[in-house]
Amino acid sequence: MKKWLCAAGLGLVLAASASVQAADKIAVVNVSSIFQQLPQRESVGKQLENEFKGRASELQSMENDLQGKMQKLQRDGSTMKASDRSKMEKDVMAQREQFSTKAQAFEQDNRRRQTEERNKILSRIQDAVKAVATKEGYDVVIDANAVAYVANAKDITADVLKQVK
């Protein structure tokens, strides 16, 4: 009786482990490669460049004006009246402060918009991964950059790239 119970238990364990191993169909996808190959990435970059072009040129002209005033102050500061030099120093300090504030706001806005657009593209890639995985019957899809080695997994990067384009 004991032998029969042991044999039945062992058989059950082997059958369960075999079905678990056979149930998972695994695929690998290289999301960063897809992201780099998308033509939308370049068009979004140009769109953002156009969106921030006005503010960038405004900052550039502010910087040039500020540098000109600083050079004039350095060059002519020793020959100016004390009151004029003091007034110009205060003006330069105020303009430098204003430039710094505007530059920080510009950088934050630019970074935020780039992140928004990148996330939109990544969301489209994620939707394409789900569509390909569902269509081809994969249970698990892993990013290729997150895995050191995979022996028995199909690379679906090309299929996902076709789906996104």
Curated annotation (Swiss-Prot):
Residues 1-22 form the signal peptide. It comes from the Bacteria. The keyword Chaperone applies. It is found in: Periplasm. Belongs to the Skp family. NCBIfam families: PRK10780.1. Molecular chaperone that interacts specifically with outer membrane proteins, thus maintaining the solubility of early folding intermediates during passage through the periplasm. This is Chaperone protein Skp. It comes from Pectobacterium atrosepticum (strain SCRI 1043 / ATCC BAA-672) (Erwinia carotovora subsp. atroseptica).
